[in-house]
Amino acid sequence: MIEVGEYKVKEGLYYTKDHEWAQVLEDGTVLVGITDYAQKELGDLAYVELPEVGKEVSKGDVLCEVESVKAVSEVYAPVSGEVIEVNEELSDSPEKINEDPYGAWIAKIKPKNLEEELKELMDAEKYAEYLKTL
């Protein structure tokens, strides 16, 4: 884990400038969630609007929304593909994202163009450097 001030960045994941993370699983699917920075900036999460299974997304599209006591924030797809699973636990317990932002994934995507799109994402070190500029 890399620490940047009060924020934690998990190694082995890919990151966007909008503070989503992507984890490539052994079967080639991708878990998506929001970073420690995002959950701390939002504050206590009250609701996660999960995407629909079967939804086709392009990289940068709105995947879903998360609602906190402070704001409603859009979560963007870090990769293109089809949503094949959602983390139903978050429907009843959105605070799991606050407790464990890198464990509480939001959706699993079957990617369409993974190799190309990963090149456009940041690794943990680059994301940590990016956080220092905010």
Swiss-Prot record:
Domain Lipoyl-binding, residue spans: 29-110
N6-lipoyllysine sites (modified residues): 70
Stretches that traverse the bilayer: none
Keyword flag Cell inner membrane: no
Reported function: The glycine cleavage system catalyzes the degradation of glycine. The H protein shuttles the methylamine group of glycine from the P protein to the T protein.
UniProt record similarity statement: Belongs to the GcvH family.
Self-association state and partner proteins as the record states: The glycine cleavage system is composed of four proteins: P, T, L and H.
Protein name: Probable glycine cleavage system H protein
